[in-house]
Amino acid sequence: MIVAADHHSEPVFSPTGRLFARLVDHPWLCLVVGALITVLAASGYRDPGWALRLLEQAGLAEAKDEPAQPRGPAGRGLGRINRGRGPAVGRGDAVLVVESPAIFTRAGAAALRQIVSRIESLDSVAGVTWLDQAPPLNVFGLPEPILPRGAATPSRFKVARDRAVEHPLVVGQLLSPDGRTLVMLVRFNWAYVDDEADVTDTLLATARSAAAEHPAVPLEMWLTGSVPLRLEWMRSRETNERTFQLIAYGLILALSALLFRGLSVVLVTAAAPVIGVLWTMGLIRCFGLQDNPFSHVILPILLSLVGFADSVHMMVDIRRGLAAGLTPREACHRGLATVGVACFLTMITTAIGMASLSLARHDAVRDFGWSCVIGVATTWVAVMAVLPLCCVTRWGRVLAKGAGREAIGGQLPRIQRGIDFTLRRPRVTSAVAIGLLAACGLVALRLQPDDRKATILPMGSPAQLALDRLDKTLGGLDVCSADIEWTDDSLTPPDVADIVTAVETVVAAEPLLGHPLSIRRLIDSLPGEGPVRERMALLDLLPPPLKQSLYDPDARSARVTFRVQDKGTVVYKPTFDRVDARLREIAARHPGVTIGLSGEPIWRWRDLYHVVMDLARSLGTAAIEILAVMVVAFRSLRLGLIAIVPNMLPLAAAAAWMVFTGQPLDIVSVCALTICLGIAVDDTIHFLSRYRFEMAQGIPRMDAIRQAFAEVGTGMIMTTIVLVVGFSSVLISDNRDHRAFAMLGVVTLSIALLCDLFCLPALVAVFDRDRSEPVGVLPTSPPPPEAAPIRARSLVES
């Protein structure tokens, strides 16, 4: 049975615990600190970046050069979309995909020309490139439209179709090989773009309106491209964020009220993380960190979950004291002295873990790490300041309602029996946990970084359907290139032709790279015979813009373009690796020549791979740093090592689940695992902190383990149930990233709770003991349900 301390003895609090407990006696200090942070946060909302500008003026920070972006809503956040883009054939701000079996008919040609005319009449459109504007490939340079004009016969259209599928600038660039799908490349005049509808809905509606005037021509149209894809993602993200945040927070509020048996208690508990998030979003604006893509969703979720977990642990302890007959001030004094220390440790460990992101090579990841450090510290201050203020006001009387009658608290004796089962077999339980960690870790090594455009789009959306259609008909939306540059003036045009031919041969040998285009194909399409190196002079017959897009002798550059499907980095990585290696071999045979790959898929292959690996390495670094902090905080290497298993097993199990279900390792999944690590560490620290406190009161080790669960078990279970329900609400989203984030949260947090309830006590029983102590020996009778309230009273009576 649990051994309670003498009612006339004073509990042993740590110096840090006694310091935190004094906050109850000085509520004015909480008000002053809260007011100062509020003023700073408000200044960030009012004048974003003012603190960063001061640091730059003082020489303590480097100014960041922001690239110019198109004006208006459509231009926000296009930096990543436009990476690696150059003036290459097949690229446009938007791509109108048109599918019809009647393209090469008189009625079809008239309908297409009217569609183009209507689109070009829009102020927001600077021009449209489509197959009828393909440059002529004849030695005289005479204009020769692909689609016949006037009263052309069906036989002329058949000849036109055969010529089109042989035209290197048409097939695979503007027209599918079967002649049923064409693309119109739309360029926008950003000076006249005032609303996102100007480059999406209005454009598509105009095209469909023109097509409706030709009912005899079957036409299907979709709009895709860099700008529509970005706007579709932004629209879906904003809609899903608002909808599912409201649903998730509503479920959390309702479930918390049910578990706490009182809405007022939930409002007090939720006030601290809400205030912490508001403070944080203002403070990061002071340093110009608000535009980070991770800070829009990931940061508020991380802070609200970690802050809510700490608030629940604090509130459960305070209400347990109230149920034992303590006054609100005494109960809060006790909670700050015990749970407050654990909350401080969780803040330190989470902040250090997030600070490891600052070692990454990419600005977005580094800035996200510093935002997290600011956020977790600010949220902890909110928890430590708001709850004491509430306890010394009228809210303190309300908190006692329903105390001791929480829904979870009544189930603790049943869960205790499961914990006792593992404590009677601690060696077996520990061996199983360590074995599972090793096995899941080995499986997790099979994860590979991946990224696809389609993952950011709602399933079945027009942009996503157009993307799939282009993959099947034209070999993909993205146009990449092998860029050839040289510094040696002695490199002659025939030499360039040989290099281009070698590069195109490498590209054409890869089945996943579609429709390569270079000066070699253009020359082969022109009349005449002979090797390409002997016919380079024919390039002067081509329109200068076309020639310069593939070969610019003044700039000493040439390129071979090709299309890439949206199959993901995992599928394309072997292809890109082979091509890159062979291009290096070609460059090595020609001194002064460099050959490199460019394009958005190439950026995802290289840079995004490094972003994900940065996050993954930071996750591992965070685990090591958290271990070091726990060793210092608990002054015990054994407890620090013990904490590795229950904290890393959920992550390893979630990663193994990703392998078995075919999920990729992307930015969303790594961020989800990082957040879950922070929450899992919180529960572990609360348990170990309480265990150390009970040991300091002179309680036997096995009794201290069981008493620690009686004290913090309610908070651990309650926070996990609430957060899992909140995450589960997002599983119905039509966005793949949101569903993946939510599912990882559900899986990881559920496993983390099981590890903290059943693995952690067994690990402590086996490894944190003297050699002379027996293992697996429990008291003959379980602790009574009222043990925790009795213990709460004994801690303050003297």
What are the functions of these language-model segments?
Residues 4-53, 389, 403-452, 465, ...:
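Signature of alpha-helical transmembrane segments and their immediate interfacial
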Residues 36, 238-271, 275-279, 348-356, ...:
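Internal alpha-helical transmembrane segments of multipass membrane proteins
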Residues 66-84, 417-544:
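Juxtamembrane segments of multi-pass membrane proteins
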Residues 87, 154-262, 498-501, 540-623:
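Extracytoplasmic
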Residues 255, 344-387, 391, 627-630, ...:
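Hydrophobic, glycine/alanine-rich multi-pass transmembrane helices and their short helix-loop junctions
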Residues 265-314, 639-688, 728, 755:
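Hydrophobic transmembrane alpha-helices and their membrane-interface caps
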Residues 302-323, 343-346, 350, 385, ...:
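Short helical (or helix-break) motifs at transmembrane helix termini and adjacent helical loops
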Residues 321-348, 695-717:
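Helix-loop junctions and hydrophobic alpha-helical segments within the transmembrane domains
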